[in-house]
């Protein structure tokens, strides 16, 4: 046996999305980091071994909530390099983002087996807190023991191997309702968790392929075994999976009984394929299909939850509690899975939608009694039902990024984790996260060395909301429809709507105010009326809206169903968005809104939305089919123009502290253009400045959320992102210098080191996008020279 001892500033155990984001974030800030993973690949539940598609905060109740920061960088890299979204390509992206960082050493196939601790204050007999000194991991492939020493550790392992070995306090199972006043919990606590799943993938071989169930699968499934809540014949996607509900094991110990649980879930999964292939209504269609891949590693949902100085609860999430130490956000609903899994004939999941995004405090991301141990992922300090929301992978990625930044600041300030709660240090963490394009819901963070707000802003043009461009087709008002609008005036006179009328008819409509918490659903009715519409094509009808605007921001126009009316569909900037009603679903109840968004699939007879509903597709026109490839990512609305015109896309919007829609779009948008001449925006100061860095945040269509199955896309980049741009610096001596010229950008967050002096004006010129005919920019941050911190 070989023994190797390693010394680092920060050791991250667990190579899922939380661990990757923690390690990369720390490393990019100069921290020498080890990433220790017990599997041969990175990615955790999203890896090619398990293949659970990552999901997060993007929900119909708050449309523009996709996670940004490091996970957005990963997704945009993956789209560019791996547009087919293959699991192999995804794993290559994950490994590349780690191996490309010079401050990270990656240790794959290294399983932690021992954690060494010491008493933190050995001179104080009353102090029971411990400190992790080292973790020991074994690599069987190389017959080598690795001992990792560091001042700080992060347990991102899911089950919490470091926390458990260190003696960190933890909880397991479902609390009683009275413990945290959580109404969904049982009266008495239970030692039950959510179970584990295996995925499978089938492929069409083009010739008949038989399947015979192995003898060791000692049961056979038929239609009745699926019950009313697992309509496998309706929701089976042979090429991409769709088997999250093949779940079991929550009544066992999801740590120590993992092998037993995996064996049973494997039996269930193969038995399901046997039914689909040989006896189901799909059997004839699946004659030429074979089982292409079957997961051998179960995807886990829940096991240990380690106690921090705050336990996140249902109330914190549903009430959107304000935390001074907020470092990340979530938005997935309370998604509880019954412990019995597949063998329970009840709902495989009950998903209660949230009113709005919620924040997660740093106090839930470290151990209460281990002074140098962070947690990120599904093992954080949260109640069982709170975890049913925060456990999803894109939220876990946000937690990892926050922990990586907290570790950087703990080392910078040479302090304990708990000392980071001091106001100055917490502000530094939040600013560092903001700089990394990491979002904290409801926080108006600015960078201390950002001088953009001191400048005068000018632009080549500003989108006024009148010219929405080509129509993509029409949508019949066979059901109610809704339009999101952004209102910034104190009143409005009317809304001009483009439509066709098959007969003389009456169009009824209502105007609503949205919630104050940035959610995108109607809450308070302000006006209701109706207008007569004459038979005719391509009409622009004025809808009077006679009301005072109390709260500026999101408002909603609801069209009552009228089968004689067809509304025109256009592509639009953020802040204009169309919705349709979703039938009540007992598995996925939404107490706040009946409205949801449609994920457009041009050419299909039905379009599936992000929440699983199926509705008839619009009548797409020739222009739509010509632009089908980019349509999936675009922001679509009905052709509605508010009067007086709402100037919500002005150049000054790049100075606001938000780099995403909140209750406003918060971005500069140019007028429609062919880009024959560049669209530009500039910042000018009264006196010369010394500029260290320039950061641009482009629009990457945050209303879109990447597929919940491993399907591919027909483009390599988000169509709203500026593809080619140039930065010019106008100097105090009257000269003009080109600072940077990027010809094939596909990223949202673009940071450029400049180190230039005597600058009076910075000008961003946009020459092309990846599809749309406008330039759309959230932020242009100009960062003055500040002190750099390095670590040895």
What do these predicted regions represent?
Residues 4-16:
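Beta1/beta-strand and adjacent pyrophosphate-binding region of the FAD-binding site
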Residues 496-499, 504-521, 573-575, 582, ...:
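Aromatic, loop-rich ligand-recognition surfaces of beta-strand-rich domains
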Residues 576-666, 671-674, 681:
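PGST-rich, cysteine-poor low-complexity/disordered linker and tail segments that act as flexible spacers
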């Amino acid at each position: 046996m070989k023994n190797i001892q390693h010394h680092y500033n920060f050791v991250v155990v667990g190579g899922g999305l939380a661990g990757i984001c923690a390690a990369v974030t720390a490393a990019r800030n100069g921290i020498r980091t080890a990433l220790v993973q017990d599997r041969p690949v990175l990615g955790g539940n999203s890896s090619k071994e398990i293949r659970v598609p990552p999901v997060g905060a993007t929900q119909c109740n708050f449309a523009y909530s996709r996670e940004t920061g490091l996970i957005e960088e990963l997704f945009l890299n993956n789209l560019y390099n791996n547009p087919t979204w293959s699991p192999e390509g995804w794993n290559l992206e994950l490994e590349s983002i780690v191996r490309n960082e010079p401050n990270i050493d990656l240790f794959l196939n290294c399983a932690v087996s021992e954690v060494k601790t010491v008493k933190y204050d050995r001179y104080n007999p009353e102090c029971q807190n411990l400190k992790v000194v080292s973790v020991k991991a074994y690599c069987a492939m190389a017959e080598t023991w690795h001992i990792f020493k560091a001042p700080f550790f992060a347990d991102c392992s899911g089950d919490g191997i470091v926390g458990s070995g260190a003696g960190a306090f933890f909880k397991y199972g479902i609390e009683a309702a009275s413990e945290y006043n959580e109404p969904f919990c049982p009266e008495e606590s239970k030692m039950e968790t959510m179970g584990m799943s295996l995925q499978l993938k089938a492929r069409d071989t083009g010739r008949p392929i038989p399947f015979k169930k192995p003898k060791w699968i000692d049961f056979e499934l038929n239609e009745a075994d699926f019950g009313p809540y697992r309509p496998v014949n309706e929701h089976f996607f042979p090429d991409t999976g769709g088997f999250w509900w093949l779940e079991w094991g929550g009544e066992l110990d999801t740590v120590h009984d993992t092998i037993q649980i995996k064996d049973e879930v494997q039996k269930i999964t193969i038995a399901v394929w046997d039914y689909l292939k040989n006896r189901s209504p799909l059997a004839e269609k699946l004659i030429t299909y074979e089982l292409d891949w079957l997961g051998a590693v179960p995807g886990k949902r829940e096991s240990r939850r380690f106690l921090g100085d705050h336990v996140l609860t249902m109330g914190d999430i549903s009430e959107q509690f304000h935390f001074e130490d907020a470092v990340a956000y979530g938005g997935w609903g309370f998604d509880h899975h019954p412990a019995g899994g597949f063998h329970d004939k009840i709902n495989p999941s009950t998903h209660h939608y949230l009113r709005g995004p919620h924040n997660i405090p740093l106090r839930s991301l470290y151990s209460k009694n281990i002074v140098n141990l962070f947690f990120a992922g599904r093992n954080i300090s949260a109640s069982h039902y709170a975890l049913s929301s925060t456990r999803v992978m894109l939220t876990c990625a946000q937690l990892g990024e926050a922990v990586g930044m907290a570790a950087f600041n703990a080392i910078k300030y040479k302090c304990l984790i708990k000392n980071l709660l001091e106001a100055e240090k917490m502000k530094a963490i939040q600013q560092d996260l903001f700089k990394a394009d990491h979002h904290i819901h409801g926080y108006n963070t600015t960078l201390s060395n950002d001088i953009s707000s001191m400048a005068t802003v000018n632009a080549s043009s500003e989108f006024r909301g009148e010219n929405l461009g080509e129509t993509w087709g029409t949508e019949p008002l066979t059901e109610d429809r809704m339009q999101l609008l952004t209102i910034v005036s104190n009143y409005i006179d009317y809304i001009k709507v483009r439509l066709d009328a098959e007969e003389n008819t009456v169009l009824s409509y209502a105007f609503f105010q949205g919630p104050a918490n940035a959610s995108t659903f109607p809450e308070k009715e302000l006006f209701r009326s109706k207008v007569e519409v004459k038979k005719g094509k391509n009409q622009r009808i004025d809808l009077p809206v006679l009301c005072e605007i109390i709260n500026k921001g999101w408002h909603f126009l609801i069209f009552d169903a009228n089968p004689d009316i067809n509304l025109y569909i256009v592509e639009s900037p953020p802040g204009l968005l169309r919705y349709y009603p979703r039938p009540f679903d007992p598995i996925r109840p939404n107490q706040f809104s009946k409205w949801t968004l449609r994920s457009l699939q041009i050419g299909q007879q039905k379009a599936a939305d992000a929440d699983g509903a199926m509705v008839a597709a619009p009548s797409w026109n020739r222009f739509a089919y010509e632009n089908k490839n980019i349509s999936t990512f675009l922001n679509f609305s009905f052709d509605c123009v508010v009067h007086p015109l709402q100037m919500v896309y002005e150049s000054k919007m790049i100075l606001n502290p938000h780099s995403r829609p909140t209750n406003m779009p918060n971005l500069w948008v140019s007028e429609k253009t062919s880009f024959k001449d560049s669209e530009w925006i500039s910042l000018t100061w009264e006196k010369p400045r010394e500029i260290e860095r320039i950061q641009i945040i482009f629009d990457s269509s945050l209303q879109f959320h990447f597929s919940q199955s491993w399907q591919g896309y027909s483009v390599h980049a988000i169509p709203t992102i500026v593809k080619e741009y140039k930065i010019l610096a106008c100097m105090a001596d009257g000269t003009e210098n080109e600072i940077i010229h990027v010809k094939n950008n596909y990223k949202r967050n673009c940071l450029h080191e400049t180190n230039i002096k005597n600058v009076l004006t910075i000008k961003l010129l946009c020459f092309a996008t990846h599809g749309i005919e406008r330039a759309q920019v959230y932020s242009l941050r100009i960062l003055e020279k500040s002190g750099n911190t390095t670590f040895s």
